[in-house]
Amino acid sequence: MTRRLRPILAALAAALLALPAVAQVTLLNVSYDPTRELYAEYNAAFAKYWQAQTGQKVTIEQSHGGSGKQARSVVDGLEADVVTLALSWDIDAIANAALLPHDWQARLPDNSTPYTSTIVFLVRTGNPKNIRDWDDLARPGVAVITPNPKTSGGARWNYLAAWGYAASKYGSEEKARALVAGIFKNVPILDTGARGSTITFVERGIGDVLIAWENEALLAQAELGKGRFEIVVPSASILAEPPVALVDKVVDRRKTRAVAQAYLEYLYSPEGQEIAARHYYRPRLAAVAARHAERFPKITLFTIAEQFGGWEKAQKIHFGDGGEFDRMMGAR
């Protein structure tokens, strides 16, 4: 047993002791757009595990959409037992509404991010527009598909990946601003979430390149349009860390804390990590990551803390009202 798993298993044991005598329980997981397939498999695995451990049947219901929009729904009263969103700022917004504590990231390993991803490009077979790196997305005549950063967490990662690449390469915020503005000038449609953008590109045939979560690009290539797409890995991208959290006010009111806590902790178990890897997320557990290493290309990654000083600062400067993104869109 690894040192990393001991506290998780101990917490699971404590959760079992705290379990109320209810034969069946339902949880709501409010998640972001492209996790549908991941949680469909994970929910079934956890339900089987939980019943074997406790005798209690658990049903997990899902809600999916753009991460920012989902966070607002929880703040507005959607009774999520757990949230599994695209970025920590969206869960911070739920904490600001006093639905969970501000130190929520300290409650699970790796700042409550059981898996990671990054941002890559999906192009049509043969790469007809010869897309190789971020600069190519701002070329005239290249139609770029990405969702709206105002509603989509994935879109915010996309935007920051492009900005961080340019700021690092050129050593200039002005050149980073120009590149990102050029990319968004080439965007014909801003869907509200990442899955909507995937559908626009894959099923509707719009655009030359999709800026996408790595897991979404791999899913599209392998399962949604086999033989129709290629993945282009840029020279540098951002380490995307989608976090998870318990919504304390809801679980305490619904008496679901024990099973909801176990649900999140099981994401860190070997089975939970294997499921994440099968659905193209980069697992945290080293042994699982090693088994799936060929699936995930090596790429130079920077973090939001390194390039932007964290989500609070990035959100205010780039995505707040009147911020960089609003000014870009106003100038289009």
Go through the PLM ranges and name each one.
Residues 1-5:
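N-terminal secretory signal peptides that target proteins for export/translocation
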Residues 9-20:
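Bacterial N-terminal signal peptides
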Residues 18, 251-332:
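Extracellular/periplasmic juxtamembrane helices and adjacent flexible linkers that interface
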Residues 24-152, 330:
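N-terminal segment of the mature folded domain
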Residues 30-32, 123-125, 143-169, 183-187, ...:
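Short beta-strand->loop
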Residues 34-38, 42, 70, 87-90, ...:
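Stable alpha-helical elements in mature extracytoplasmic
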Residues 126-132, 151, 164-172, 250-258:
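Short helix-loop capping/hinge motifs at secondary-structure junctions, enriched
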Residues 169-235:
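Ligand-binding pocket segment of bilobal, Venus flytrap-like solute-binding proteins
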